[in-house]
UniProtKB/Swiss-Prot annotation:
Compartments reported by the entry: Cytoplasm
Name under which the protein is recorded: Amino-acid acetyltransferase
Keywords recorded for this protein, A-Z: Acyltransferase, Amino-acid biosynthesis, Arginine biosynthesis, Cytoplasm, Transferase
Cross-referenced PANTHER family: AMINO-ACID ACETYLTRANSFERASE (PTHR30602), AMINO-ACID ACETYLTRANSFERASE NAGS1, CHLOROPLASTIC-RELATED (PTHR30602:SF12)
Gene: argA
Pfam families named in the record: AA_kinase, Acetyltransf_1
GO MF annotation list: L-glutamate N-acetyltransferase activity
Amino acid sequence: MHDYVTWLRHASPYINAHRDRTFVVMLPGEGIAHPNFANIVHDLVLLHSLGVRLVLVHGSRPQIEARLAARGLTPHFHRDLRITDAPTLECVIDAVGQLRIAIEARLSMDMAASPMQGSRLRLTSGNFVTARPIGVLDGVDYHHTGEVRRIDRKGINRQLDERSIVLLSPLGYSPTGEIFNLACEDVATRAAIDLGADKLLLFGAEDGLLDEHGQLVRELRPQQVPAHLARLGSNYQGELLDAAAQACRGGVGRSHIVSYATDGALLSELFTRTGNGTLVAQEQFESLREATIEDVGGLIELISPLEEQGILVRRSREVLEREIEQFSIVEREGLIIACAALYPIADSDCGELACLAVNPDYRHGGRGDELLARIEARARAQGLKTLFVLTTRTAHWFRERGFEPSSVERMPAARASLYNYQRNSKVFEKAL
């Protein structure tokens, strides 16, 4: 019960922030075929009940492949796009139609066995997407493969205003009545841009973008995306990342990539600070700045656990209030996640780096290095020549960053006289 109450308290600011916001959610055909699909539907219904305006875009690739195989047809691609001839279009229409019915049934059912028991909602679909043919590229005729020409923004917003969930399929229609097979990623991206959506949420097989070491990349700016695309090459994660960046460049506030295989990934991404996937956004996620008196409470929350473990020297609220101007902090969405302090040592050209701390959830993002660089820059600006640090647990971290072993005797007298021999901290120094 305590964990639930704690989670709800932490989620409450996000619940309020997401109300009446427009989210476009893209779920590929692989996600619909996955056993976790039912849980994703529950989470979408929960978002709807919390006042989120939802547009759901679904894919159909594996379902199309299954129908082609059943008919003995060979799929053809060029530039990673399906070539949709007449027989293939029949398979596309069949797959999309059945998927649409399956999604409508799942979203419309009375979820007797789900956490959202008794929920009722209205689902709307229609000819909201106008398309045009891709035509001929590199001498290859794409036939009925198309691209989005226009999204019926007014029509979709009218349905959202009436509290409906809007379902968009990867099919588009031309003014002359032709049907075109579309990429669901393109439909979702254009819908998010044209609707001025607050978020584009893209489901993939992975938790998000993984770096070359297999570690999750939690945050990106659109301008950082090309380097990752060059590394990824032609794969689906690259397609999702490219779609996320395009949406942000088109004015969408934030794009998220989460896994359809992880239960609760969508809710974790939307209602926790750390999230569960990769966030692509134009705005700055964090700020590195000097602390003010309003930050004292956040600093106490950050450093208290480390003080209790004996890693940091205890500082009372009164001490922090008096010394707040010595601190630099990293703030993320109102939460102080890292800090460090610079104390000039009297009657010398030396300073002390103290109280360097990073929230455990953010210790692999280089924030300690950012704070160290900020403290060193502040020290140089004040004319200091040497930076001392005292530590009981992180000697190697400082050695790796240019600090050399030192001693109490090498410290200026004003600081050496305050050395706590009971803590027996190791002393290091670095020439600036």
